[in-house]
Amino acid sequence: MDPFLLSIILCSWIFVVVSWKKLNCMRRRLPPGPPRWPIFGNLLQLSPLPHKDFARFCTKYGPLVYLRLGTIDAITTDDPEVIREILIRQDEVFASRPRTLAAVHLAYGCGDVALAPLGPNWKRMRRVCMEHLLTTKRLESFAAHRALEAEHLCQFVWAKAQSGKPVNLREVLGAFSMNNVTRMLLGKQYFGLQSAGPGEAMEFMHITHELFWLLGLIYLGDYLPAWRWLDPYGCEKKMREVEKKVDDFHQKIIDEHRKAREAKKSASLDDDNKEDMDFVDVLLSLPGENGKEHMDDVEIKALMQDMIAAATDTSSVTNEWVMAEVIKNPRVLRKIQEELDGVVGRGRMVAESDLGQLTYLRCVVRESFRMHPAGPFLIPHESLKPTTIMGYDIPARTRIFINTHALGRNTRIWDDVDAFRPERHLPASADGGRVEISHLPDFKILPFSAGKRKCPGAPLGVILVLMALARLFHCFDWSPPDGLRPDDIDTQEVYGMTMPKAKPLVAVATPRLPPQMYGRHGKQV
């Protein structure tokens, strides 16, 4: 064909497509939003801290903002009423997930629970979690393991205090969360005297951190398909590398468990006593789909990854933020300890049965979730069909960014947003009931999402957060390292799928209970 004629046809086709899209947009009543560039849309208006850019848009344009991110329609909000509309009233419309490249590479083709689009596979995998892994009975069966890890945590901090050394709280809280999850999931701990070894532990931590960093990226290839051909920063290449490392690690765990089960069968031992089984053993014992004898390894690995990711990094990030804010505000520490002394006393350690009575500590955790949510956004949702919100048209396949960071600092619903004030969450009356850590009907705080996509591991996450904090505040007084005042505690954050402190929290612990309460010696974490 004549090159000139081909050019005319191509230009005409582009003109028709652009004109049709422009006309279609004019017919729709989209929510207000910032002006958009051709091709890129609003992508060029985003900084390395997109949650703050989105909050700025909501301040300027209203509680519901429309964005065009390359080829993708998107909305963002930090308003409780809009969030309730999305997660509860129109849950059936907005409960799906977008198929991002990170989810495809790092979540087994979106075959897990957290990142999978809404559909039969997601329903089945979530049912496996709720009916076999995260039941109340199964979580209670690991209570002794959690108590042991809490004991190890306090003994390690006590040993540091005896030697006069400050405590790196990021390390010890990370080890506490990781050990609790890996004991339940894999039947082993990765830190401590009975650990699987420092090499395997470091490999495990490194893989987890890489995974979270990549999942938190706003990768341009998801919004501009042509970018994938360039990939100048090698993001997709890195995803494939981490994908292989994650898969190899998970496969090794499955092979170890399968080998142990075969050995038990050879020795005529009962390998299906579910009370003594870790999560991987339970998954290996379950039937697969469509009459298969067992679940596929890929399905098992996808669920393993969800459990590890959801219950380790998020709970340790939350605990570090709480510790930072409490050390920065000594009056809050005194009130927490007064409550602990009243509920628990100084003659025994905090037990899980005490956690529901620790009203002020629960308010402290809620206030930390307000100021420092584990992640800047909920995991993005995607609309399954066209709908309306507040009278505005929302197209099908619109990506939804619920800005939890901005929600907690929204001056329309919170006063004195930069002050750490747990008292704002106290019940109106003394008998107002237990303070809930998860979301309340007002949707002002949303640590575990809501609706169909609410985190299935929320009860476990709450226990891990409260238990670590209660033990550390009950057993020790806390202060900044020598030369620093409480006001010097840094609260800068790092953007990602989770938002940890920019610098690890280091503090000095001083025992406040009788010496015999800490055991004979500190154990290594």
From Swiss-Prot:
Keywords: Heme, Iron, Membrane, Metal-binding, Monooxygenase, Oxidoreductase, Transmembrane, Transmembrane helix. It is a single-pass membrane protein. The chain crosses the membrane at residues 3-23. GO terms for cellular component: membrane. It comes from the Eukaryota. Its EC number is 1.14.14.130. It is found in: Membrane. One of its GO terms (molecular function) is fatty acid in-chain hydroxylase activity. GO terms for biological process: anther development; lipid hydroxylation; medium-chain fatty acid biosynthetic process; pollen exine formation; sporopollenin biosynthetic process. Disruption phenotype: Male sterile. Defective in pollen exine and anther epicuticular layer development. Its cofactor is heme. Heme binds at C455. Belongs to the cytochrome P450 family. This is Cytochrome P450 703A2. The gene is CYP703A3.
